[in-house]
Amino acid sequence: MKNRIILCLGCLLAFLQLRAQVNTNQQHLCNPNSFSIVLLGDPQNYVKYDYNQPVFELMTAWTAHHIDSLRVKAVLCTGDLVDQNECILPPFPRFGNLTSREQWTFVSRAFGRLDNKVPYLISTGNHDYGYTRSENSMTRFPEYFPIERNSQWKKTIVAATNNRNGLPTLENAAMEITDEHWGRILIIAVEFAPRDEVLSWARELVATPRFKDHTVILITHSYLTGFDSRRITKEGYKITPSNTGEGIWQKLVQPSANIRLVLCGHYATPNERLDYTTGFRTDKNAAGHDVHQMMFNCQALGG
């Protein structure tokens, strides 16, 4: 009898332990035939302080955990992976407490949770170039994000063009995903303040016979403001040649019949108001189709 009681208690404990390991907070799709694309806003303020880094680590960990339950086909990031691209000391305490190498190492490790599981594209930001904010074309991005690091890219990256230093990198790249209901989707990421030749490359790419019937998503770092959702027309960065949000619209988005969504980050005001860290507008392209344009940069809200 005593042995039976011990056996029953053992089975009960094993059952309770199994129940405790079930994740009751895992998210699921309302429509099992749908899919997800995850958008990560600018990471820079999570990355530049060691005590903020767990916030971004949680974002990529959560995404990796939900790849199957949310049918995540791609992850996109609006850029500014670091706050200073090339500094051995932060310029001022409010600009962080880590060197540039420590920032790049961390953000690379955080994205490592997604490697070989899901393809992702990053639109490099102004802080990813120069020393602190695009004083020149120097960037550590290709060093930390070579195409070889994620096996999913071999299946999905379909085009790329050279960066400002004449190197073929993922700063300007296109990724193709498919869905039985949506059909074929082309996602294009372009460098911060893209040059005319990059916009021409993207415009010609979406018009080719291979991609002209795809639904195209463009992700770029700087494009819309928050609050009133204006396309940006002027910025004070030294990096040249360049285009602002309005230039991207006029030279790439508006003339292209199949670009239907533009995503960006960059703009934020640290005043705890969501409407200052997000933006949205819809305009017609040359073919008369709606183009939805969204800015998302919630780092100023603390998460």
Question: Model regions: which residues?
Answer:
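Short catalytic/ligand-binding loop motif for oxyanion handling, primarily in non-cytosolic enzymes
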Residues: V47, D83-E86, D128-R133, E197, ...
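His/acidic metal-ligating clusters that form di-metal
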Residues: A64-A74, N116, R164-E176, H181-F280
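Extended active-site neighborhood of metal-dependent phosphoesterases/phosphodiesterases
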Residues: C87-S200, R210-F211, R273-M295
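N-terminal active-site segment of His-dependent metallophosphoesterases
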Residues: A20-T99
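Active-site-proximal beta-strand elements of phosphoester/diester hydrolases
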Residues: S34-V47, G183-A193, I219, H292-N297
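Bacterial Sec-dependent N-terminal signal peptides
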Residues: M1-N23
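Stable alpha-helical elements in mature extracytoplasmic
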Residues: N52-T63, T78, Q103-A110, S137-F141, ...
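Active-site glycine-centered loops adjacent to acidic/histidine catalytic or metal-binding residues
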Residues: D42, G79-D80, G125-N126, H221, ...
